[in-house]
Amino acid sequence: MTALKLPSLPFALEPAGSPPPGCRVRSGVMTLTAAARTDMFVDPAGTGPVPDAGRFVGLPPAGDFTLAAQVSVEFASMYDAGVLLLHAAERDWAKLCFEYSPQLKPTAVTVVTRGTSDDCNSFEVDGSTLWLRITRSGAAWAFHASTDGAWWRLLRYFTLGLELVRVGFLAQSPAGAGCAATFDHVTFRPGAPENLRDGS
């Protein structure tokens, strides 16, 4: 599978992981289709293999930035999700997810993996669309979500402890037969909000 170039991104997106997701790009809108039983989660209980779901990631320019997208997911099975991803190494990465919870509710979820993964469910969403945003601010990362693309709720503020971090997109279906996630209104902006906690 070849690299992707979205008009709004100043870097190419390279395929990684296995099996590769299905991918369609039309007018700057990207749809990824996850294969069955695909995930990225390193269970802190130490059970199961280290998953390596197919994804598209690229190396952003140096400095602070925000990467945002309106994410729509065709939910069918629990844990189906569309994801904005940070990836530094096999066991050093983080996910900002719009995910189907075990209660079958669309939910904003974050996962930070440094050796093993944590798992943090944030808030439920009415509908199948949510705005997600990644921010790099110095050595730190921030995950935000928004129901309207205007007011942003801070979900996580953390570091991966590594300088070389790729960013990108993922669809997952850990418990299901596959999942399609669409990423619309993808934007990349240099700089970070002055205040990560005031909704801007």
Residue ranges, per PLM feature:
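Extracellular glycan-recognition regions
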Residues: 1-200
